[in-house]
Amino acid sequence: MSGNLTQIEQDLRQSSEALQDLRSKYDGALLKIGEANEACKTELESKKTEALEALEASKSEQNVKIAALEGKMEELKSRFITDDNQILIKVGNNADEGEIASLKEALNLALQYAPSVPQSVTREKNRVVVEIQEGWEWVEAIGLYHIDLSHIILTQKNFDVPIMCDFSRENMHADNGLLVKLYLDNSKISIKKLHLKAKAKELTQNACWFNNYIYSRFGSGVFIEHLKLDSSLLTTANCGQAGDYTIFTDDGSQLLAHKIEIIKSNATNEGFCVCENSRAYVEYLTLSGGNNNYNGVFINTASSAYVGNITISGNSGHNGVLISTASSAYVGNITISGNSGHNGVLINAASSAYVENITISSRSGHQHLLVDGSRLTNHASCNFTGGSTGNNQKLAIVRGGLATVAGNGYSRGAGNDANQAVGVWSAHGSWCFYGNRT
């Protein structure tokens, strides 16, 4: 019996010790769990604090960026956006007033801002305007290749004060033997009003036949409200070669203009040219000033033109108006008061023309009007009051030409005798008069 009690006592003692050991392990485990929880809590709080601090820093950084962006927007708005919600970029010499010195830079900037104008804005206001300020001089040439700037309006603040243009070779765009101030290759541009005047320059120094203000080719388009080109200060010691070609539309290009004024000089070769399957629509075309070397107006090689009024003063070395090589033209009025070295109006080489009124009050070296293998319809009047030199023929039709004069035809004076009447001359061609002829 005593042996059993002893065994029970030992078993209880061992169980108690095991329980104490288990209790100790349990307390140790709880302590470690508490320590782990505390460590996790501390780490979590630390990460939370770091995240909040990073968030606040990011918000602060974003606020700085937003403030900078808002400031930039306000700057751009005050600098460029007008009351009409147009974007106005000024080209000039006053950087403090936000003016940009480079026209090329201004056009690039305009090209960037153009898509940002809201579509909800009306068409009259949905545009970007590049405005040249008074006193700015055009030095850096511009070449446009495969770019459409027709939605950007190029203009100047004061049309009465010309923009002086540097025609030095190093400041002209060179391409395929051409020197040009504004060159377009498969490109488009819109001009509201520009008055350009070339600075004094001897063009033989450029070693180039073609010196132009604007030359467009290869499917380009030029849209003009009012353009005035003044070449009166240009000179050349090599007449007929190194010269000025003002504005030239070439190689399948288009010209749409309300009014173009050209002031020629002895350095001007062609006054106004539309060539190589090109198209032109001009309401008012005026040529004045000095004596150009070739033609006043030249429409050539399968080209076509509508010109409301052509007015030419100042002599033309060859022809006042030449329509040539399968070209066609409608002209409302041709008025020539400057002498022509060859013909006042020449239509030749399978070309055709419809002209309402032809008035020539000056002298022509050959004929006032020559239709050579071509067709002319003169609807209203054909009035010649100036004498001719050379063969003294006022009206001439040759080599299969046909001229229809539906209005009154006048032929008065020849050579140096304004009272000497002259008839109509025709060789292998025919006139058809529907009005009076004196």
What are these regions (language model features)?
Residues 95, 104-105, 115-177, 196:
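N-terminal extracellular ligand-recognition/capping segment immediately after the signal peptide
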Residues 1-75:
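Short, low-complexity N-terminal tether/leader segments at secretion or assembly junctions of large
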